[in-house]
Amino acid sequence: MKLNTKYHGCIEYEEKDVIYFQKGIPGFEELNKFIIFPVEDNEVFLVFHSIENEDIGIIVTSPFNIENNYEIQLEEEQITNLKLQDEKDALVLNTVTLDSDIDKITVNLRAPIIINIKEKIGEQIIINSDKYKVKHSLFKEEA
């Protein structure tokens, strides 16, 4: 199958690559099917893209690229919804807000996207803690 994206050209994918989000994601609740693919010539960023709306693609990264000790505690309901049997099956990604000024690029560490890579289902959760910021600076040390 092919997806003609607004910013990343034509992307080929297979049905097995599609990740289903029952509730969508905040701001895009009507979109339930996404794929993930690498940003060209970049090992840190990925594109989290809707296959239902070719204009909706979000840059994401692993939180472990930013915070070595990043930890989240999923609630039982979230574990059940995601059908997680083993934490090794969980892929954790965080959204990136880009800016032409590199010092203003931020990562949302408070609302990770959790994906069960075996079952191909996902959910974006909100961490109820001040430990992580919604706008964590990616390249500049926090004051």
Curated annotation (Swiss-Prot):
Q: Which InterPro entries match?
A: Flagellar_assembly_factor_FliW (IPR003775), Flagellar_assmbl_FliW_dom_sf (IPR024046)
The transmembrane residues are none
Q: Where in the cell is it found?
A: Cytoplasm
Question: Which keywords are on file for this protein?
Answer: Bacterial flagellum biogenesis, Chaperone, Cytoplasm, Translation regulation
- Coiled-coil regions listed in the entry: none
Output one GO BP term. regulation of translation
One GO CC term, this protein: cytoplasm
Instruction: Keyword check for Chaperone, yes or no.
Output: yes
Which SUPFAM superfamilies does this entry report, sorted A to Z? BH3618-like
Function comment: Acts as an anti-CsrA protein, binds CsrA and prevents it from repressing translation of its target genes, one of which is flagellin. Binds to flagellin and participates in the assembly of the flagellum.
Which family does the record claim for this protein?
Answer: Belongs to the FliW family.
Q: How does it assemble?
A: Interacts with translational regulator CsrA and flagellin(s).
Q: What is this protein called?
A: Flagellar assembly factor FliW
Q: Please report the organism this UniProt entry assigns to the protein.
A: Clostridium botulinum (strain Hall / ATCC 3502 / NCTC 13319 / Type A)
